[in-house]
């Protein structure tokens, strides 16, 4: 899975369209169980509403939605489309509608549910998830500062250093930069320093406004 975005936090938004109230709730989640639990909570909280439409996306290939009594294709799917267009996953969104007595039509419903989902996403903000690599680097004392400088120059950090006959560094950096770091270390040490990637994991970045 390539880099992607997740909600920075939960949010709640509301607007009125032709006397119908649309209340949007968004929550970052990591599993379908968490998503379903949140949907159930919202349905319980807004038990007296006409509709509690929902969608969720988990990872790169798990997505579900529900129209909860609205005409097919006018609620859950348009909500889902909002997050897909923004490359956002690990999210559940529930839009509650209190009917105001005026029919909105299929087009009006689609626009209203899309707006509610997007409003909730804008309110939450997003975080860029980037694949990072963790690596070990055995480093002679004489080259420590230069090696640390190369790691930093490529957007990485030195997480720990064990001192013995040489210095064994544990570093983290964007996975896409590991090849460049390996090349720089080879040049720096005439092939004497070998970088070993020990793990990879996605990490969130700072909040980004939509």
State each model region's role.
Residues 125-143, 169-171:
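Short glycine-/aliphatic-rich beta-strand segments at the starts of folded cytosolic domains
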Residues 147-152, 180-189:
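Short amphipathic alpha-helices in soluble, non-transmembrane regions
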Residues 157-162, 189-206:
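Conserved short beta-strand edge segments in small beta-sheet-based binding/regulatory domains
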